[in-house]
Amino acid sequence: MRYAVLLAVVLLLGAFTAEAFSPPPFHICKWKLWKCLKWCAPWDWKCRRKCFWKYWWCLKKFGGHYGGYGYGDDGYGGGGYGGGGYGGGYGGGYGGGYGGGYGDVGYGGGYSGGYSGGYSGGYGSYGHRRKY
């Protein structure tokens, strides 16, 4: 009986300790920035600019809060805020880049930009690159 009480106390303490500990929150935007920069060559300023633009747009979508894959991520509804980011804005929101984007979307970006080139993609939409 004494061992049962001791085991119950240890299990309760373990449960409360595990509940109290929480790792630092996962920030999807930082992870995406890291993955994007990993694919860029050190001297490729266009690729890096695209990555930081995507990071800025991700922070704008998530409000800078910690969060997972939710509202408007990766072209949900055509690239963030209801199909085109900034009210149609720079060629389709996330991954759209300026006027259709550079990189994932390709030059020209096609129809609404969005994720992975939208409708026509322009110059093959860089299909050989990994999509984040």
Curated annotation (Swiss-Prot):
Q: Spell out the subcellular localization from the entry.
A: Secreted
**What start and end residues bound the annotated signal peptide?**
1-20
Question: Does this entry carry the keyword Secreted?
Answer: yes
- For whether the record's keyword set contains Signal, the answer is yes
Say which domain of life the source belongs to: Eukaryota
GO CC annotation: what is one? extracellular region
Q: Which UniProt keywords apply?
A: Secreted, Signal
**Mind telling me what this protein is named?**
Glycine-rich protein 3
Species per Swiss-Prot/TrEMBL record: Pinctada maxima (Silver-lipped pearl oyster)
